[in-house]
Amino acid sequence: MRRKGVILLDGLMALFLISALAVMVLPLAGSWLSALERGRTGTKLSETGLFAMDFMVEKIRNNRHSAAGGVRGNSYDYRDFTARGTEGTYRFFVDREKLKLQLYNGNIQPLTGEYTGPEAYAFLPGRSSLFRQVEGGPVTISFAMHHQMMGMDRDFETSVIPYADFYKKGEVYE
C-alpha cells in the first residue's frame, strides 16, 4: 500500500511533466496557427486579385469599340450590350481602395471590397495608374492587392488588346 505523500508526489510529477510538455509545444502550435493565417490571407488576396483581373480582361477584350480614348489613368470606359440589347458605356474605376464598375444606367457595383469603410484587403492601382495605353497599343492593367494589418501584397499586371482594335473594326479592308 502506498502512502499519501507518494501519491501526491506522483501527481505533482505528472502535472510538472504535462506543463513542461505544454511549454514546449505551445510556441510551435502558435507558429503553425500564424502560418495558417498568413496562408489564408495570401489566398484571399490572390483570389480577389485574380477575379478582378479576369473580369477586367474579359470586358476590355470584348469591348465593342476601339480602346483609344477609353483609358483615363485609374478609369477605363468600354462599350457593351445592355439588358435591352442596345450598346451602353460601362466604366471601371478605383474608389476608396475598391475596384468598382459603373453600369450604363449610372448604377455602381463594387467588384472588390466587402465594407463601406476602410478595407482589410485594399485594391491599389499599380505603378503610375491602373490602366495605361501607349499609342494605340495594348491596354496594360496593373494593380496590387494589399492586406493592411499583415502588410502582405500581391501584384498583378497584364496587357490585353480589345478585339475591336485587333480586327480593326470600322476600317475598310483592302
What function would you assign to each model-found segment?
Residues 1-2, 173:
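Short, low-complexity, intrinsically disordered N-terminal peptides in bacterial proteins
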Residues 66-136, 170-174:
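Type IV pilin-like appendage domain
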